[in-house]
UniProtKB/Swiss-Prot annotation:
Key words, A-Z: Calcium, Calmodulin-binding, Hydrolase, Iron, Metal-binding, Phosphoprotein, Protein phosphatase, Zinc
Family: Belongs to the PPP phosphatase family. PP-2B subfamily.
GO cellular component, one term: calcineurin complex
Residues at the catalytic site: 225 (proton donor)
Top-level lineage group: Eukaryota
Ligand binding (Zn(2+)): 192, 224, 273, 355
Taxon lineage: Eukaryota, Metazoa, Ecdysozoa, Arthropoda, Hexapoda
Residues bearing PTM Phosphothreonine: 61
Protein name: Serine/threonine-protein phosphatase 2B catalytic subunit 3
Organism encoding this protein: Drosophila melanogaster
Cofactor note as given: Binds 1 Fe(3+) ion per subunit. Binds 1 zinc ion per subunit.
Biased composition (Basic and acidic residues): 546-555
Transcription in keyword set: no
Gene coding for it: CanA-14F
Amino acid sequence: MSSPAAQSNSSSSQSQSAAQQQQQQNQKANVNNTHDNKNAAATTGTAAGSGSGGAAGSAGTQQQGQGGTGTSSGPSSPTKRSTISTKERVIDSVAFPPSRKLTCADVFDARTGKPQHDVLKQHFILEGRIEESAALRIIQEGATLLRTEKTMIDIEAPVTVCGDIHGQFYDLMKLFEIGGSPATTKYLFLGDYVDRGYFSIECVLYLWSLKITYPQTLFLLRGNHECRHLTEYFTFKQECKIKYSERVYDACMDAFDCLPLAALMNQQFLCVHGGLSPEIHELEDIRRLDRFKEPPAFGPMCDLLWSDPLEDFGNEKNSDFYTHNSVRGCSYFYSYAACCDFLQNNNLLSIIRAHEAQDAGYRMYRKSQTTGFPSLITIFSAPNYLDVYNNKAAVLKYENNVMNIRQFNCSPHPYWLPNFMDVFTWSLPFVGEKVTEMLVNVLNICSDDELMTEESEEPLSDDEAALRKEVIRNKIRAIGKMARVFSVLREESESVLQLKGLTPTGALPLGALSGGKQSLKNAMQGFSPNHKITSFAEAKGLDAVNERMPPRRDATPSPAEEGQKSLSAAAAAAANANANSING
């Protein structure tokens, strides 16, 4: 058998000189050609011969394609390079979000004029959006309905009670799977539909569309996050501006002002977001409240949204009904005695509230001595809260005087960078690390004496020279420190993103980066430096700062607010005095 080069040349009618000339041209052309073009090689080999000769021709052409000379010398190993198409998505298994926004004609039924919530559901699951006009119409029509409802609404059983949602739209879909279709199930939501999660506007639009469609069987109460103060501080306002506009955000705030504050379920249960107030003694006190406003920093409306039961509820060390809520920075803690006193005075069985994350999704507190029923029930419906709590969620179904708790776990959801960060901002640490690394290397090339050299021939004194050298050294150290910060940001990007996700403003704790990996690790571990955030208690401890009422811009209260604050304090003191006299 002839050599591969000879086999290839034998199929050509060209002269020997022409073949040599062609071979030289191939050698010259292949100096810069390092790609393994197998398809072209196979085609050329087939044209060069058939059968075994064709295979030999193919081998010879492949060798020439790698820069070989076409001789019978040993073949060189091919250089393989992967190529990525710039016209196709790299991860094609993830569906691309719909690019077309739904119009009012798509969203609203032409016959009934009501939103098609099934259409919205499927569109939002795919991360689609709707036109601003459609979003505004849903929000405003929902607000019109909410405005007609009483401050404390009356609901008859059967009913399913749900706690905090916090923008976890995909878990809200799971909630309706567990609780039943809104078309056939009566629902009561206890507030906190927005903030912290990254799909808050989808939750609002979907729940409002359900409210418009089923106004007599779906009820929405106000939570402490349904206000301007918290949504500006946390994520909802930013989300509205990114996904829609500030006009949509303003419409949501106006709608939130219309939400009822409480519900009386089956004439037996008071349902509210937070809890009791020292200024609310009877149910009529709730009915008389003016709810159509931004919640104040203190007073009965604030307490209904912000108050909590004592941590040692049912095992208190003193007899006070109300104490200052140091965890929230506003409102009160209420005791077991205060709860039982309120229930007895209003002939109620229990208080059902939300407002606090629970490991199991719910908590039954100490039973009333008169009824034998839990005096207080907390329900929380956001599983794996903030993607770090690892808690279960729950809904409460009450029917035929039987209370049933149904738990559920979190559902997968699309990933957003913390605080809706874009990919360019996210990539800055990678770019910054390289820039500072280059700058440090440039500065390290020169010695201190070279950096001291100036055009001026005036000599510096020893003290001036030493001071100048120290200034230069400090600058190099500062740049080196900045380089370490960027290096930590790049290497520990996942930890940084998780820590940013736990802060409302997206700012990291001071010193978390400059101290290197260990300080970042300690910050991630929160209050337990020997453990990672793997338990519900540790996640709750780390997130406690975000459960407080954020500082207000107008920190100095108005005279009216001062008077209201004094009234609240006096009411709490009177309630505690009454409790002491009863116990005495």
